[in-house]
Each structure stands twice: as C-alpha cells, then as structure tokens.
C-alpha cells in the first residue's frame, strides 16, 4: 500500500491546487495523520496507530503518543524532524502542509475573521494518550505568555468512551494547587526542578 510519505511534496504556489480541491470536495481537505512522539512518556496505544509503528521515530525519540489534527504547528521536541507536527493535505498523488495551504489561500480556508485577527490557523486538535500520568505542568494565559514573548495555550479535554475502553495505569487528572500554597513555594520547586524530587507534587492536588 503506498504511503503518504511517497507522495510528491508541493512547497509553493499551492493556491490553484488547493482551491480546485475545495471546489471538487465541497470545501473539504483530506489530511493525513500527524504522529508525534514524546521521549518522557509511555504511549497508551489507543490512538489508532499500529503497535509496530509506536517507535517509528527511534527509541531515542520516544514512542508516539499523540496524533495531531489540522495542525500548522511544529512540535517543540528536541531532535525533531523539520515537519514534525504539521498536518499534510493529500490531493491526488501530491501532498502539501496545511500551513502552506493556509499561507497561500488565507481566508478561503480559515475564514475572514480568523485570517484578519491571526493571519494563520492558530489552533489544532489531537488524540493524546499515555499509559500513565503526565508530569505536573502549567498552561499560561495569553497575558502570562506575552510576558515572555509567547502565545497562551488554552486547552480543553474530552474523553470519548469509544476510544477509552480501558483506563490504563492512572486515569486521573489533578488540577491546581492545594489551598494555602504560596508563590514562593512554587518558585522554590521551579528552582529545584532538575534536582531530583523538587516537591511540586506536594503542592498540587495530587
């Protein structure tokens, strides 16, 4: 069976190709899965990927535990492939990144209001699945992220029962800190982040 990787990549002047596809399909673009590995987590094996391909990027990169949809964002993984995280549009025997399609076609794909405000497609969805819990971490608001020259990262989660027939090893999520936690306590944990047990879980709802 031919692989998406075997398709010819179109890297520029994609507007006519994309608009013809949108016209032929009634406004739909077919996107190939974007598989993302994480070196610090164990895959949960429930994202519709054959188990033999779980470590397709190599053991040093970690197992694939995420499948991104409609993504124009590259991963922040160390040692990543140049197009890691990017969704590819599949048109006949050709492929091009959704990011390139949006850059060339703008509001035709994302709509006038989003194109005017962001000049890009600023969000994506994903299957996210691990065997055990993920590390304690935070997501900055837009105002917080702006202080360090970044964008905010709001997220929402949905756990469809048809994709979660088993709970794996630790099917729980803890959010926030224990009442009474001070900013100085959190800062001290961050200072000790690479010193073994930094104590952050002592402050969390875990």
Short names for language-model regions:
Residues 2-183:
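Transition-metal
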Residues 178-197:
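Short, flexible helix-coil linker/hinge segments at the edges of structured domains or between repeats
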Residues 194-206:
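Loop-centered beta-sheet repeat module
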């Amino acid at each position: 069976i031919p692989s998406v990787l075997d398709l010819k990549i179109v890297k520029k002047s994609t507007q006519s190709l994309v608009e013809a596809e949108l016209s032929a399909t009634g406004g739909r673009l077919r996107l190939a899965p974007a598989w993302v590995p994480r070196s610090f987590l164990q895959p949960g094996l429930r994202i519709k990927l054959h188990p033999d391909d779980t470590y397709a990027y190599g053991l040093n990169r970690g197992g694939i535990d995420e499948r991104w949809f409609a993504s124009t964002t590259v991963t922040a993984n160390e040692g990543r492939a140049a197009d890691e995280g990017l969704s590819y549009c599949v048109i006949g025997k050709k492929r091009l990144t959704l990011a390139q399609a949006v850059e060339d076609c703008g509001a035709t794909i994302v709509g006038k209001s989003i194109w005017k405000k962001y000049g890009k497609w600023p969000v994506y969805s994903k299957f996210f699945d691990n065997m055990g819990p993920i590390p304690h971490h935070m997501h900055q608001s837009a105002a917080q992220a702006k202080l360090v020259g970044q964008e905010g990262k709001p997220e929402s989660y949905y756990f469809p029962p048809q994709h979660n027939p088993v709970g794996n090893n630790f099917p729980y999520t803890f959010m926030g800190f224990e009442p009474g936690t001070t900013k100085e306590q959190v800062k001290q944990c961050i200072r000790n982040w690479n010193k073994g047990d930094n104590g952050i879980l002592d402050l969390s709802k875990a």
